[in-house]
Amino acid sequence: MPIEIPTDLTPELVPLSWLIGEWEGRGRLGSGDEDSEHFVQRVSFTHNGLPYLQYRAETWLSDDAGEKLRPLTVETGFWALERKLEEGDGGPGLIPADIVPVLKTADEVEERRNKEGGFDISVSIAHPGGITELYYGQIKGPQIQLSTDMVMRGSHSKEYTAATRIFGLVDGNLLWRWDVAASGKALEAHASAFLHKVS
């Protein structure tokens, strides 16, 4: 499946452009063994002309045939190249960015490539229950690796201390795995899924 890059995409999102669109599919909780519960998921990555992707994932528990049983959770966030913000960038709050993006050309984006040949990225994801994750990691072609730098929890949130996520594009499909450290345990398999692009 060819990757189409939107003509209005800001240059620094080109490394992330293969994520843009809506994805649907099925997954398993835990390690994915025969006792692991099933889920279905719909994920969207959208852009609005600013230098980040907006992310939303909605997940339902399902039977083993993929029929939805009940809502499981929703998470939402932002994905961007990790770089020092400059005067032309927007924020904080409603302070507008310059109309011309800070990184204006493909060459300026290429200069941000790291020693491993990929690009450093940051991802923030908010969850119900007062939990927000801040991930740092790398995108290298169709592969993404993320590790939490910080997990912020509300005063009544369940214990959750760290996570890693990996994403990959394989034969036009989005595969991901999420490991978490929660409830006093070390990092362990939390969920994984296989999603196909629907738009």
Swiss-Prot record:
The record's free-text note on cofactor binding: Binds 1 heme b group per subunit, that coordinates a highly solvent-exposed Fe(III) atom.
Catalytic reaction equation(s): peroxynitrite = nitrate
GO molecular function: heme binding; metal ion binding; peroxynitrite isomerase activity
Cofactor: heme b
Disulfide pairings: none
Span of the annotated motif GXWXGXG: 21-27
Keywords, alphabetical: Heme, Iron, Isomerase, Metal-binding
Catalytic EC class: isomerase
InterPro entries: Calycin, Nb(III)_bact/plant, Nitrobindin, THAP4-like_heme-bd
EC numbers for this chain: 5.99.-.-
Annotated pathway: Nitrogen metabolism
Domain of life assignment: Bacteria
Residues binding heme b, per UniProt: 190
Similarity section: Belongs to the nitrobindin family.
Function, as annotated: Heme-binding protein able to scavenge peroxynitrite and to protect free L-tyrosine against peroxynitrite-mediated nitration, by acting as a peroxynitrite isomerase that converts peroxynitrite to nitrate. Therefore, this protein likely plays a role in peroxynitrite sensing and in the detoxification of reactive nitrogen and oxygen species (RNS and ROS, respectively). Is able to bind nitric oxide (NO) in vitro, but may act as a sensor of peroxynitrite levels in vivo.
PANTHER family: PEROXYNITRITE ISOMERASE THAP4, THAP4 PROTEIN
Subunit note: Homodimer.
Comment, domains: Forms a 10-stranded antiparallel beta-barrel structure able to accommodate a hydrophobic ligand in its interior. In fact, this fold hosts the heme group, which is located in a wide surface cleft.
Protein name per UniProt: Peroxynitrite isomerase
Species: Paenarthrobacter aurescens (strain TC1)
